Amino acid sequence: MLSVGDFARSKVFYDKLLRFLGFKLKHEYGNMAGWSNGETLFWIAAADAHGRKRKYRKGDIGFHHYAFELASRGAVDQLGRFLEDNGMTVIDPPGEYYGRNYYAVYFADPDGMKLEAMIWAPPKPKRAAKSKHKRS
């Protein structure tokens, strides 16, 4: 569960984002909401009064960032356009990071929490060359 500073604002943000990613709002209890894509749940909840006094800072105890794994580079590109079209903060545009096999877009939620959508295709192992000589 992710604690958020302004539940109403964050719910609008995450509802748009998660619906785009194929999730549906399944649960809502007061200041908590949960979405599902049939495989996993993603929850947000209002931070308590003490927590709302502090701003998210990457490097503090807690999440560094949260990543969603997508099915293809095209899906990452589509999300990048969706983020821009909806005025969401893009930190790093769709591109290759950490090498050619890692393709991602980085963006921020209303509290500045860093989010990522990525596809990682590990390199395929090289197959041994076929011998031109017949075995007897």
Q: Which residue ranges define each predicted feature?
A:
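Vicinal oxygen chelate
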Residues: 4-9, 67-110
